[in-house]
């Protein structure tokens, strides 16, 4: 009976596969949004203000960061929880694939969230005259919470590795 239960639990890892497919669709939507922004910029580039252009470029950076985060979560999640990716040509295999454990994924996700939050905060500061001070303060507090959380997770990971190495 125990053997059957273990096989069922182990096979259930494939339930993550549709989640990864959903993330792939999310990445497609982000790509469409990215090119929508590019298409919007092109006819207006000569009449657009510098700050307007910077805001749109920040949006593009934001989309790129979220897209990179999605790719990292999809690939590492697949390799860690579902199955190893069999890429015949090793020269095409991404260098970090197969090397990220759950803790390193968490740290990379946390640092990506901090980077995304930084871009949002910069965009907010560029439009500060249009935004209530309370909203800016709240966004700074949220950003600092992300930063402290990322540091905390990295510290815990570092300490657990030290303890593991002592054993």
UniProtKB/Swiss-Prot annotation:
Record InterPro entries = UPF0114, UPF0114_bac
Cell compartments where the protein resides = Cell membrane
Q: Which Gene Ontology CC terms are recorded? A: plasma membrane
Q: Which Pfam families match?
A: UPF0114 (PF03350)
Which regions span the lipid bilayer?
15-35, 53-73, 136-156
The alphabetical list of record keywords is: Cell membrane, Membrane, Plasmid, Transmembrane, Transmembrane helix
| Topology class, membrane | Multi-pass membrane protein
The entry's family comment says: Belongs to the UPF0114 family.
Q: What is this protein called?
A: UPF0114 protein in repA1-repA2 intergenic region
Native source organism of the sequence: Buchnera aphidicola subsp. Pterocomma populeum
